[in-house]
Amino acid sequence: MIIRDENYFTDKYELTRTHSEVLEAVKVVKPGKTLDLGCGNGRNSLYLAANGYDVDAWDKNAMSIANVERIKSIENLDNLHTRVVDLNNLTFDRQYDFILSTVVLMFLEAKTIPGLIANMQRCTKPGGYNLIVAAMDTADYPCTVGFPFAFKEGELRRYYEGWERVKYNEDVGELHRTDANGNRIKLRFATMLARKK
């Protein structure tokens, strides 16, 4: 049962809309202990918390976390817990039912990715889920925007061998950034919802 829809926090607080893949994931992933890695201004964390998920929301930007805390207080979301952390230097041990990272990994140092994904996998309870959406660098859509990291073709899928992939694709999507002509930049995005066996 959805208590707050995807437009609630957008309309009331002018946040970016909840990511479409999070909206799809909640059709499968039941409320439980959740970790949002790179939560930004809370577009996903606030939606999840308002709909019964117990959310840890982490981001390196203290101003973003302060904004999440402000909205959390107004909305009385006691099941939302924030922390300022640099994902490039992060290790964690708590067990989660759902760990998500949407359009965040491409902003991290490439050397961080294998360890961070391993940490996500280790800290996911059996039967729990990981959701990742991140930019790719492919021959047909090369990543020219200067991200420190972008997945190669099939790379994210290989990280999750042995997991049940509920959804996986490497479809073309658009960044919010635009090119010199004002057109949104197109890239492939690795999109995956996987369940730990």
Swiss-Prot record:
| Chain sites annotated for binding S-adenosyl-L-methionine | G38, R43, D59, T102
Q: Which GO terms describe its cellular component?
A: cytosol
**Cross-referenced InterPro entries, in alphabetical order?**
SAM-dependent_MTases_sf, TehB-like_dom, Tellurite-R_MeTrfase_TehB
Does the keyword NADP feature in the UniProt annotation? no
Indicate the impact reported for R177A.
35% of wild-type methyltransferase activity on tellurite
Gene3D superfamilies recorded: Vaccinia Virus protein VP39
State the EC number(s).
Answer: 2.1.1.265
Mind telling me which SUPFAM superfamilies this protein's record contains?
A: S-adenosyl-L-methionine-dependent methyltransferases
Q: Which domain of life is it from?
A: Bacteria
Kindly list the places in or outside the cell where this protein is found, as annotated in its UniProt entry.
Answer: Cytoplasm
Which molecular-function annotation in GO is an example for this chain? S-adenosylmethionine-dependent methyltransferase activity
Q: Which family does it belong to?
A: Belongs to the TehB family.
Protein name, per record: Tellurite methyltransferase
Q: Look up and give the organism this protein is from.
A: Escherichia coli (strain K12)
Q: Which gene encodes it?
A: tehB
